[in-house]
């Protein structure tokens, strides 16, 4: 048995960041992880491995689509799937550097202030639940992670399948679907709703679907999946179209079930502790991430909010500061979201639909990458930047980007929103030329007297 100021259960982005910050603030800290490796889903079977695949296949796309346009001629590129798949222990070093105790094994909470790992029970003044999430799946579909897979299985396929059906047109489905489409698979995306990327700006969603269709992905929207049948090395996905209840089926070598994720809290003993839970399985936490059990906190995918690694990291740092007697800060209005397709999509703040529902008067500044010299020079001029600002005050309320390096460009607008900046503030800021980021300034100018290169 050991005594700690804080024990964090879960070593993913929220948990390990929380542990490091707690230690930096002078708290004796331990972090429990049972998966055998720190970093959680993001580092091991999620964000980082998928971005390695997305980058590799983006480069392949550039070779096939744009090299000849640039005057680069030569032998055709061949795909070595095994080498691509293998390019995927820095956190343990950070733990040692910051004097965080790493407890290997699955953790549970037998009583307030106690964490059991294996046969040992440790005590802590504060416990943080940072156990993340798992794929939610669909009723009636058996996941084997071989031919019917979640994102975990999709990142470790032995070979590129000839055909793939992706169930779900959210971030995970579109990213991995586009990877395999660029590698030569015939990819069909089946989505229950009538549009892809639920919750995203409608104009961006339509533009992304149009571009991905040109890249070879097929879309079946408004389709309710009924089940997956396995026979003779093939999977048959059965679905009905919601508009007329007609029945249909698609065969595929691999089926990727990308219908979302759910909090992973089983085995913690929360029910016996009397921890309040929400109807969808999240731990109920207040504005300081505290549960109804004294000394017990929860962050990341275990609580409400977008299931994003960077949201969990922010909460991890913030709750560490709360425990240390400081003020933890997370601005939930300024949490960006990114889809790492080609082109990338990024968003922060309000959408037009949300502002209309609120009845808030707003103005739109939009600029196409067709007017951006850098984007035109490298044949990546598809897409646009859209900035939404308050009609009266000009304060930036949201932004939506589809185009090259959108996931990096969005942060300029995040910083502006964090400081309560206006669109004019961005418009008055000199941007280096030629850069993609000039499109942000042009969109800000479009909120006022007009963009220059439109």
Swiss-Prot record:
The active site is at 433 (proton acceptor). NAD(+) binds at residues 168-172, 191, 225, 258-261. Disulfide bonds join 42-47. Binds 1 FAD per subunit. It is an enzyme of class 1 (oxidoreductase). It catalyses: N(6)-[(R)-dihydrolipoyl]-L-lysyl-[protein] + NAD(+) = N(6)-[(R)-lipoyl]-L-lysyl-[protein] + NADH + H(+). FAD binds at residues 33-42, 51, 107, 301, 309. InterPro entries: Class-I_Pyr_Nuc-Dis_Oxidored, FAD/NAD-bd_sf, FAD/NAD-binding_dom, FAD/NAD-linked_Rdtase_dimer_sf, Lipoamide_DH, Pyr_nuc-diS_OxRdtase, Pyr_nucl-diS_OxRdtase_dimer, Pyr_OxRdtase_I_AS. It comes from the Bacteria. Homodimer. Lipoamide dehydrogenase is a component of the alpha-ketoacid dehydrogenase complexes. This is Dihydrolipoyl dehydrogenase.
